[in-house]
Amino acid sequence: MAERVLANLEAKFTEGNYYDILQSYKALYNRFSTQKKYKETVTLLESGCNKFLEYKQWNCAADLAKLLIECYKNFKIQYSDESKEPIIKIFKNFKGECAGKISFMRDAIEWSSKNGGDSKGSEEFHTLLAITLSEEGDYIDAQKHFIFGNDYFSFCEMLKNWTEDVDEEEKDLYITRAIFGLLCLKKLKQASDLYNLFTTKVIKGDPSPLLNFDRFLLLTLERDALPLFNLLRQKYERSLKRDPQFKKFLDQIANIFYNVPIQSGGGLSGMLSNLLSGFGGGMGMGGNSSGGGLASMEVDGPTIEDEMD
């Protein structure tokens, strides 16, 4: 019966009355859900999504895609290779900008976080959403999802595009914020890989004091070296004051890697939001001189480097 119903629905697409077709899908969704017919419900929604996508009816497809996540929640479906496959397939088949597509993946991330996936949501889902947001020019939101994702190559490409029109002396702020976000999730290797890729692809000339701090920080966190961590913060205090959020994040990083107690605050999620919101403006807080007072590089002289060896 379900096959016949689907065939009848799909035959109506040539008529072009997409709103009525969508309502028919929703009515069947409600019927199958009430009858606890999980497989039939998923088949219905997958088929409907793919058919609407075929006819470039993005909003209709997004409506059914969101119902698929609702179905997963109602039937308490766990995150797995099998359950994530239709989500990924549907999401990748959207073309162009569509707010419903973004909302669909946000729902999928929330579902995965509560049903067997990573507590912050599926890294694969975060990455897919981050790439899409980046393509649409929403770099602030994209960065948040790249931090929770697992693709530092695409992350670096996004940062490269984001900083194309940024003054050279301001680019170190972008990579530092990204690195701090990753370190707050204890993603040391990914932070190191991103730093190396960014400084190779994007940075021209000698590294700034802040970039040198980033490099030494990443090396320090590979070992049990809290005194050196504190010394780095002291030596690079001037550069770190360029963004008032850096202190809070370094306190969090000290807690994560060295169990240093921190005062209770808005939690990691709130801290990440504050860090990322800084990209909206005020990038040049205090500037980053490539000469003058910091040109002597006394804050990143051989004393620090020797301690790294």
Swiss-Prot record:
Segments of this protein annotated with the region Disordered: 290-309
GO biological process: protein insertion into ER membrane
GO cellular component, one term: cytosol
A UniProt-annotated Pfam family: GET4
Domain of life: Eukaryota
Alphabetized InterPro entries for the sequence: GET4, TPR-like_helical_dom_sf
Family: Belongs to the GET4 family.
Cited function: May play a role in insertion of tail-anchored proteins into the endoplasmic reticulum membrane.
Protein name: Golgi to ER traffic protein 4 homolog
